């Protein structure tokens, strides 16, 4: 048996042209499902039907000469018996069809059929979709044996139409006999004859045979289906839209990816997309989503049709459209998403949980903040969550975090429902749920039970995390945002073995996540003695994040103006440093240092021009906010009071900057001497005479994406950054977007006064 299957993997199309090849064969399954799905492999781009037939002939002598199969009976055929059907029933069939489930268990359901509910809502769908519930008159066992006998006897004379008829009739055998049929060499012969005659099949023949294959559960990985895909490709331009959709649906039911057929189908659609009816449009979007294969140009055309039919689409179809666009990674415009949100809000109580989850997926993907829809979600989601499967709960939670939408009722319902059924979570579900709670910086009332159950599940799911390593850092960061640090898991995630695994096994670059975790542990877990990232990876992560942060901030005119105003107010660029105090937190800061007299220190060596390093005298550093100055500011008459003045002092020799004296994070070196209101920076003096800054300020230039939606509550990452800055002795000065951005439209003096108050009031 093993030798047979190995041989069948090497030969693309099997055929037993000589009856003697069957003489020693009885009831052996040639249809075992491969452990590797076809979807994970690239099928050949071009397959010649004539070439396939030649392969069939060449295989005949090979299998005739090899006595690789043995049995106790010399008579080939199909024995339909209770014993054989019982044994064969353990075989895994290839078709993802419905199975009986306990309706009370929300975690057990047929997701394949669940996504096809929309096909039952209009009679038009019956024309271009496959309905698994359709029944036909059953074929008796004796009639089936007779057909297989005719195949053996008349194999050289069977016509194409007869082959199609036989396949269709055999698919009407009782379901319990299907595995036995698949184990019959006579049925294998019939299938090979269909390959030889396939050039004579017309469109309807092709559809009927594919239906028979679906009913019988032909494994999706079987090489014979390559020939059928090629025939479908050749037949595309002979089919109408209904037939094309039906063929695509049948391939989906077989569970086989057919990229070549879909590419040609797309070409057909580019010419005929305007002719799509409503049912054809929705069904097409479903097919596209399930195959994850589409051109963006075609999807834009389909979006225009969605608008055309928007008032006729029902809620299940809305969910199907959202899921199709989501799975194909295609955006819907904000205008269409708002229309969809309006439709959902108008009948929110009648919206199925399935459609609700599909719609929130698309809102998450497009980041459209439909306020009324968000409010409605806050009202109905807590009632729906107990009846949702954990995957649905995960998508709902992730929607909330992606839109920064903190609704305590929703989050509490999620936290209450998960602990009893945490075993149903995949590693992905655990990761996304922990990330969502951490991102929203929210601890539910049952936080202890909630987090302990999820952390325990991470331990149980470790084999799964080895397969999908990207989910483990996501889990641990979500926990770290809320100050949970499971040491054993962190030690494993930062181990050289896991880091190497993460680099090799995932398409995602996890360096940023691992670097953020590593930096967080270094600050918040002083007693931690486990694994840390290598110095090389830390440096690489720091450089990457600084490049991204600097590029982002320097592209914002409002930020550049803020830097200039701070430099003007404090006395020059050497008093302000734009950098990442905590590189692992992914955002930059404007650092200011003050001495014991709350005067700014010129600590930024990088801002000092090389020609002026020898001697720098700065006068009038900083601005004292006196009553006289405030009067001038309010009257708008002050001019030039914020400009620092520099000049070289004669008789002084330049001093050399000594890099060896540098110290990390917060230990920036400077030489400060206060003489009659003037400050001198003459390079770096020995550490003994250095003046340590009394206060280090981290000026935060914030935006609305750092806060929960419609509130002033920081998100998890940014709250964690503030927490860590405080641990390192920094005082945060927040230039909040709701205060600072409107002020940018005011006069320069008003902006300077605001900055002065922020910086020096925070110091007090």
Swiss-Prot record:
This is FAST kinase domain-containing protein 5, mitochondrial. GO terms for cellular component: mitochondrial matrix; mitochondrial nucleoid; mitochondrion; ribonucleoprotein granule. The gene is FASTKD5. Residues 1-27 form a transit peptide. The keyword Iron-sulfur does not apply. Residues 697-757 form the RAP domain. GO terms for biological process: mitochondrial RNA processing; mRNA processing; regulation of mitochondrial mRNA stability. It is found in: Mitochondrion matrix, Mitochondrion nucleoid. Keywords: Acetylation, Mitochondrion, Mitochondrion nucleoid, mRNA processing, Phosphoprotein, RNA-binding, rRNA-binding, Transit peptide. Signal peptide: none annotated. Expression detected in spleen, thymus, testis, ovary, colon, heart, smooth muscle, kidney, brain, lung, liver and white adipose tissue with highest expression in heart, smooth muscle, liver and thyroid. Plays an important role in the processing of non-canonical mitochondrial mRNA precursors. The modification Phosphoserine is found at residue 95. The modification N6-acetyllysine is found at residue 507. One of its GO terms (molecular function) is rRNA binding. Its main location: mitochondrion. It comes from the Eukaryota. Belongs to the FAST kinase family. Found in a complex with GRSF1, DDX28, DHX30 and FASTKD2. Associates with the 12S mitochondrial rRNA (12S mt-rRNA). PANTHER family: FAST KINASE DOMAIN-CONTAINING PROTEIN 5, MITOCHONDRIAL (PTHR21228:SF70), FAST LEU-RICH DOMAIN-CONTAINING (PTHR21228).
């Amino acid at each position: 048996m093993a030798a047979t299957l190995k041989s069948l993997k090497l030969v693309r199309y099997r055929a037993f042209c000589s009856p003697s090849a069957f003489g020693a064969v009885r009831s052996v399954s040639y249809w075992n499902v491969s452990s590797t799905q076809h979807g994970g492999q690239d099928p050949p781009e071009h397959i010649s039907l004539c070439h396939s037939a030649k392969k069939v002939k060449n295989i005949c002598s090979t299998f005739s000469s090899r006595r690789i199969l043995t049995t106790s009976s010399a008579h080939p055929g199909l024995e339909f018996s209770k014993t054989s059907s019982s044994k064969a029933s353990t075989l895994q069939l290839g078709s993802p069809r419905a199975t009986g489930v306990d309706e009370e268990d929300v975690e057990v359901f047929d997701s394949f059929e669940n996504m096809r509910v929309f096909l039952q809502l209009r009679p038009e769908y019956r024309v271009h979709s496959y309905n698994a519930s359709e029944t036909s008159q059953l074929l008796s066992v004796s009639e089936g044996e007779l057909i297989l006998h005719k195949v053996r006897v008349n194999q050289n004379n069977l016509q194409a139409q007869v082959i199609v008829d036989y396949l269709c009739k055999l698919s009407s055998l009782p379901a319990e006999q299907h595995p036995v049929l698949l184990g019959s060499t006579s049925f294998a012969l019939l299938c090979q004859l269909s390959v030889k005659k396939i050039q004579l099949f017309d469109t309807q023949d092709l559809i009927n045979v594919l239906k028979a294959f679906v009913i019988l559960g032909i494994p999706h990985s079987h090489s014979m289906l390559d020939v059928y895909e090629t025939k479908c490709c050749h037949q595309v331009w002979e089919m109408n839209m209904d037939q094309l959709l039906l063929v695509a649906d049948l391939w989906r039911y077989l569970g086989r990816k057919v990229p070549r057929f879909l590419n040609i189908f797309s070409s057909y659609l580019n010419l005929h997309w305007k002719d799509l009816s409503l049912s054809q449009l929705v069904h097409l979007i479903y097919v596209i989503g399930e195959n994850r294969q589409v051109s963006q140009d075609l999807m834009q055309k389909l979006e225009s049709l969605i608008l055309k039919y928007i008032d006729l689409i029902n809620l299940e179809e809305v969910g199907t459209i959202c899921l199709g666009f989501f799975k194909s990674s295609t955006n819907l415009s904000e205008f269409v998403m708002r229309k969809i949100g309006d439709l959902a809000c108008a009948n929110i109580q009648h919206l199925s949980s399935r459609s609700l989850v599909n719609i929130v997926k698309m809102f998450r993907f497009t980041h459209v903040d439909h306020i009324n829809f968000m409010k409605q979600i806050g009202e109905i989601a807590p009632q729906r969550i107990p009846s949702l499967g954990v995957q649905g709960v995960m998508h709902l939670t992730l929607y909330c975090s992606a839109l920064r939408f903190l609704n305590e009722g929703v989050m509490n319902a999620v936290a209450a429902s998960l602990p009893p059924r945490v075993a149903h979570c995949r590693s992905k579900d655990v990761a996304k749920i922990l990330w969502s709670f951490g991102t929203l910086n929210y601890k539910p009332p049952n936080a202890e039970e909630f987090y302990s159950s999820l952390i325990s599940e991470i331990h149980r799911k470790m084999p799964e995390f080895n397969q999908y390593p990207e989910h483990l850092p996501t889990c641990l960061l979500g926990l770290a945002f809320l100050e949970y640090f499971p040491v054993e898991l962190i030690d494993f995630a930062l181990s050289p073995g896991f880091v190497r695994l993460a680099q090799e096994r995932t398409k995602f670059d996890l360096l940023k996540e691992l670097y953020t975790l590593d930096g967080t542990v270094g600050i918040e877990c002083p007693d931690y003695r486990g694994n840390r990232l290598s110095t090389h990876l830390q440096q690489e992560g720091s450089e990457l994040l600084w490049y991204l942060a600097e590029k982002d901030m320097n592209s914002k005119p409002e930020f550049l103006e803020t830097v200039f105003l701070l430099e003007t107010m404090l006395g020059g660029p050497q008093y302000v440093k734009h950098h990442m105090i905590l590189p692992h937190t992914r955002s930059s800061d404007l650092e200011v240092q003050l001495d014991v007299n709350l005067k700014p220190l010129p600590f930024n060596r990088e801002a000092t021009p090389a020609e002026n390093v020898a001697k720098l005298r700065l006068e009038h550093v900083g601005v004292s906010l006196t009553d006289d100055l405030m009067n001038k500011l309010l009257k708008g008459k002050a001019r030039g009071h914020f400009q620092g003045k520099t000049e070289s002092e004669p008789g002084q020799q330049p001093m050399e900057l000594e890099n060896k004296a540098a110290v990390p994070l917060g230990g920036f070196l400077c030489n400060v001497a206060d003489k009659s209101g003037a400050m001198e920076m003459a390079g770096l003096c020995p550490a003994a005479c250095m003046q340590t800054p009394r206060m280090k300020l981290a000026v935060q230039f914030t935006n609305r994406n750092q806060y929960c939606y419609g509130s002033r509550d920081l998100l998890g990452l940014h709250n964690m950054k503030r927490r860590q800055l405080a641990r390192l002795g920094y005082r945060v000065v927040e230039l909040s977007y709701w205060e600072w951005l409107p002020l940018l439209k005011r006069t320069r003096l008003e902006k300077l006064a605001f900055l002065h108050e922020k910086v020096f009031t925070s110091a007090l």
